[in-house]
């Protein structure tokens, strides 16, 4: 008997406080296909809390549009500006909360791991990552976004696709109960 090919939708997010990128992959068997990529433009919001609300609303809207099975999100890198890191962490947390509210499992990937998975070079530029994705997913140069944040979101999804079927060291959560069970020290 022929088994039907399993389809999986992966949403990838590149968190940001000015521009947040996302990409959506459909995986049929072992073949990935880009079905969307774009940005959430937060530049018009002066208040950080309004940005967080907009991130939550837009991520939920993207989830409702594409019905992803899993979320791959880029983990914040460690920078020198503590305030910027705090705001970026909040933005990432709000995007994760939106996915968790729909019981979507989440996996975080370090920027270096994503770049390494896509280009073979952990120090690759955003342009090199975008160019490699364009070649691997066969989308037209004209479809290349103005903001590389969109291809960074797509890169997170593609990195997750490459990790499917392999043991993953990063923490993944299937919902709030799973998060609490794996992180009791973080809950008061």
UniProtKB/Swiss-Prot annotation:
Q: What does this protein do?
A: The RuvA-RuvB-RuvC complex processes Holliday junction (HJ) DNA during genetic recombination and DNA repair. Endonuclease that resolves HJ intermediates. Cleaves cruciform DNA by making single-stranded nicks across the HJ at symmetrical positions within the homologous arms, yielding a 5'-phosphate and a 3'-hydroxyl group; requires a central core of homology in the junction. The consensus cleavage sequence is 5'-(A/T)TT(C/G)-3'. Cleavage occurs on the 3'-side of the TT dinucleotide at the point of strand exchange.
Q: Which PROSITE patterns match?
A: RUVC
Which Pfam family, an example, fits this chain? RuvC
Q: Where in or outside the cell is it found? A: Cytoplasm
Q: Which residues of this protein are catalytic?
A: 14, 74, 149
User: HAMAP family this protein is in?
Assistant: RuvC
This entry's Enzyme Commission designation comes to 3.1.21.10
Which amino acid positions bind Mg(2+) 1, per UniProt? Answer: 14, 149
In Swiss-Prot or TrEMBL terms, this protein is called: Crossover junction endodeoxyribonuclease RuvC
* CC cofactor: Mg(2+)
Keyword line: Cytoplasm, DNA damage, DNA recombination, DNA repair, DNA-binding, Endonuclease, Hydrolase, Magnesium, Metal-binding, Nuclease
Task: Give one GO biological process term.
Answer: DNA recombination
**What catalytic activity does the UniProt entry give for this protein?**
Endonucleolytic cleavage at a junction such as a reciprocal single-stranded crossover between two homologous DNA duplexes (Holliday junction)
Fetch the CDD domains from UniProt: RuvC
Instruction: Give the family per the record.
Output: Belongs to the RuvC family.
Which top-level group of life is the source organism from? Bacteria
Q: Which organism is it from?
A: Bacteroides fragilis (strain ATCC 25285 / DSM 2151 / CCUG 4856 / JCM 11019 / LMG 10263 / NCTC 9343 / Onslow / VPI 2553 / EN-2)
**Subunit text:** Homodimer which binds Holliday junction (HJ) DNA. The HJ becomes 2-fold symmetrical on binding to RuvC with unstacked arms; it has a different conformation from HJ DNA in complex with RuvA. In the full resolvosome a probable DNA-RuvA(4)-RuvB(12)-RuvC(2) complex forms which resolves the HJ.
What enzyme category does the UniProt record give?
hydrolase
Query: Which free-text remark accompanies the cofactor?
Result: Binds 2 Mg(2+) ion per subunit.
Annotated GO CC locations? cytoplasm; Holliday junction resolvase complex
Q: Which amino acid positions bind Mg(2+) 2, per UniProt?
A: 74
